[in-house]
Amino acid sequence: MVRHNKNIMAKYLISFPSAAMVVPDGEWEAVGRDAHAVIDEAKAAGVYVFGGGIDEGVPPVLVSADGAVAEGGYPWAPPLDGGFTVLELPSHDEAVAWAARIAKACRCAQELRVFGFDPQS
């Protein structure tokens, strides 16, 4: 996998853990409205790939290379929860700007990561 290809747009993961969202009870509706508005803007701009939230009511399952299945995720890794959005953007600066918009809407910091370039995916 190539780390970056400047000739094509990169996909960026914008995410947050559930614990990052400290929202007073009366503000949840506004947060949802604002977050959906930013996602709608990303869709209208043609940069939205997909997104969602981890269903914390369904426990993870670890499937080994030999096909063995075990309840729970990696024992040494922190639990994966919260929400995420994947956007396809022409620059890191634009990714930072979208992450800032999402952070403002969600009322919490967002982690920004870039996917490595794989010409076969």
At which residue positions do the language-model features occur?
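Conserved, structured core segments of small domains
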Residues: 2-121
